[in-house]
A protein has these predicted regions:
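Short, glycine-/small- and polar/acidic-enriched structural segments
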Residues: 45-198, 202-208, 219, 224-225, ...
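Sec/Tat signal peptide C-region and signal peptidase I cleavage site
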Residues: 40-44
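Conserved C-terminal helix/tail region of periplasmic/extracytoplasmic solute-binding proteins
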Residues: 319-358
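Pocket-lining segment of extracytoplasmic ligand-binding domains
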Residues: 111, 191-286
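Secondary-structure end/capping motifs
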Residues: 248-331
């Protein structure tokens, strides 16, 4: 009997020990699970991103795919930036959004910039997005428009009154001693080749990518006057308010580095960019067309100067000639000293991209 009691006591003690061990394991497991659910200390959390909003000249379209793919590629996040985008209807619109405080950086054209400076706005150019002039004026062959003088008395479409298409139309008109008073300017919107094809305008001011899309959509034989043959200056810059330039240089340096990263990616991986444009660009349904647009825009992103000094490098002499020309043409009234409104000190270290292969 005594041995039986002893055995029962031993069994009871073993069961208690086993149960205690099980409780310890369960408690340890619960603690581990709790640790996974509780946030890590603040030092281990992701760093806070700085918000930078870009005021665009357009809606989110294929040719700016490198600005649209942040969710997939994270170029700006990698530089500590939370990127925002405010769409516009022309470079002048982008500057208005910048000056009203809705954005930190404007994606705008030289004509709109010169006009704003002419009105006394305090602005600073910090990056040359497209060092090639991509603007043109296109007409159907039936109109017999071959040179700027032939535009007199014609109806000419522009994207908007605040766009680079209008500014560059003024440049072409000035070549023949004409002004907007000698033509009828018609606002057509971004799809400015439809009115041309339908006979609503005699010619339309556009860009290389716009002409490409027009041809894809059935545009027949046309005559093209390229503005670069008369004034070959950059098509678009990044511009900031002077106060922003003075107060946020380190942030702007990171922004430009991130943009340069994105531009380099689009140059080196146009096929990937074309596929992602389907997801992010409002006009990006056709991958093949996307690729053609992206290749054109890649070509306009590089120049002999960027071959030497990296993407974004600004040609001071060319820009001064452009500003002087706009004054000579009567588009602006004041002298603009480019060295006072253009700075290259925020550009990233040299990253040369010698060509954008087709």
């Amino acid at each position: 009997m005594k041995n039986q009691i002893t055995n029962q006591e031993d069994l009871t003690m073993k069961n208690q020990a086993t149960n205690h061990s099980k409780r310890r394991i369960a408690g340890w497991a619960a603690s581990c699970l709790l640790a996974l659910c509780v946030p890590m200390p603040s030092w281990a959390q992701a760093p806070k991103l700085d918000k930078v909003v870009v005021a665009g000249w357009s809606k989110p379209i294929t040719e700016i795919t490198n600005l649209l793919v942040e969710e997939d590629k994270g170029f700006f996040k990698a530089r500590g930036i939370d990127l925002g985008y405010v769409p516009g209807a022309g470079g002048g619109d982008a500057l208005r959004n910048l000056l009203s405080g809705q954005a930190d950086v404007a994606f705008t054209d030289p004509g709109s910039l010169f006009s704003a400076l002419d009105k006394g706005e305090k602005l600073r150019v910090i990056y040359d997005i497209y060092p090639q002039n991509v603007f043109n004026v296109v007409s159907l062959k039936s109109q017999n428009i071959f040179k700027p003088a032939d535009l007199k008395g014609k109806r000419i479409g522009v994207y908007s009154l605040a766009s680079g298409t209008r500014q560059n139309l003024q440049v072409l008109l000035s070549q023949a001693g004409l002004t907007e008073a000698d033509v009828t300017v018609v606002v057509t919107g971004l799809l400015n080749f439809a009115p041309l094809m339908q006979g609503q305008v005699d010619a339309t001011a556009a860009t290389d990518t716009g002409l490409l899309v027009g041809r894809q959509r059935g545009l027949g034989g046309v005559n093209v006057m390229e503005v670069k043959n008369h004034l070959n200056i950059s098509s678009d810059f990044f511009v900031v308010r002077e106060a922003t330039y003075q107060q946020k240089k380190e942030l702007l340096k990171r922004f430009l580095h991130a943009y340069q990263d994105s531009a380099k990616w689009m140059i080196q991986a146009p096929e990937e960019a074309a596929k992602l444009a389907v997801k992010y660009a409002i006009d990006g349904q056709n991958v093949s067309l996307n690729l053609d647009i992206i290749r054109l825009r890649n070509e306009s992103s590089v120049s002999p100067l960027t071959d030497k000094r990296g993407l974004g490098a600004l040609d001071m002499d060319s820009l001064q000639k452009g500003a002087n020309a706009y004054k000579t043409f009567g588009v602006i009234q004041r002298d603009i000293k480019i060295s006072e409104v253009v700075s290259q000190d925020l550009l990233p270290p040299v990253m040369t991209v010698k060509s954008a292969k087709r």
